[in-house]
Amino acid sequence: MSISEKYIAELYNKIQEERPIIHCITNAVTVNDCANILLAAGASPTMAHHPLEVEEITAGTKALVCNFGAIADYEAMEKAGRVADELGHAIIIDPVGVSGSSYRREKCQTLIENIHPTCIRGNYSEIRALMEHCSTVTGVDSGDKNLDTEAMRQYADKYHLIMIASGEKDIITDGTAIYICENGDAKMAKITGSGCMSSVMLGAFLGTESSVQSAAACCAFVGIAGELASEKTDACGGGTMTFRNFFIDEVSLMTQEKMSRCKVHI
């Protein structure tokens, strides 16, 4: 199935109509931006992370997003994840920092095996570290420019999930199809939280329709918002903080006409 602007628009409209509640266990650095971008898309965020409340909270949502930037909240991720798995909710894992921390990598792999996520989304270095069970960089930024797409497909097939590697080109696979998304802008790598925001947006899209096509549509949607924000930033002579605000703006201002920029292919 090809990813058209009409398909993306249908998903976006459905999100705005249904206002799905997305449970995000994410890090303190990006929690505000993650909540705001979900609101901009028409979804409803809840950022609960106490282990004594997350099971009750996640039971009333459409999707759960577990961000390993919040590794201290691992117990909460595990508890919420088990409930989400039992209820058939979409579960997204963002393996922040697994490329530079063996502890995070081991805990992430355990979580994958225990809660059966719908989707894993990370940068190239994080995805490679998960697949190869080794450190690939120091810190959380991606140093990789290339990735073995066949290895990604095999990993996704083994764990019955959608795997997304975000970078200059986003690679999306469910173990069968492999989609390449070429939307996006270099400024997205210059702000903290663009990856975290992408992951919570996947919560909104996959919580509305759980499919690899929906995941690819989300990647295009986020990338297009980045392109439009970059153009506005350049036009006003703004910097990175201006770009961040325009980025969230463009999510709320998205139209089907703008979605015609979609560059996704198999």
Task: Give the ranges of each region predicted by the language model.
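Glycine-rich phosphate/adenosyl-contacting loop at the front of the ribokinase-like
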Residues: M1-S44
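Charged C-terminal helix
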Residues: I3-K6, I224-I266
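Active-site cofactor/substrate anionic-group-binding motifs, chiefly glycine-
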Residues: I37, A41-L87, I93
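Glycine/small-residue-rich loop that forms an oxyanion/phosphate-binding "nest" at active or ligand-binding sites
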Residues: A76-G122
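Conserved phosphate/ATP/ADP-binding segment of small-molecule kinases
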Residues: R104-I178
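Short, small-residue alpha-helix embedded
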Residues: A129, K190-A220
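Short, well-structured alpha-helical segments that form the helix of a local strand-helix-strand
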Residues: A151-A156, S211-G226, F247-I248
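Short pre-catalytic strand/loop immediately N-terminal to key active-site residues, enriched for Gly-Thr
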Residues: E182-T192
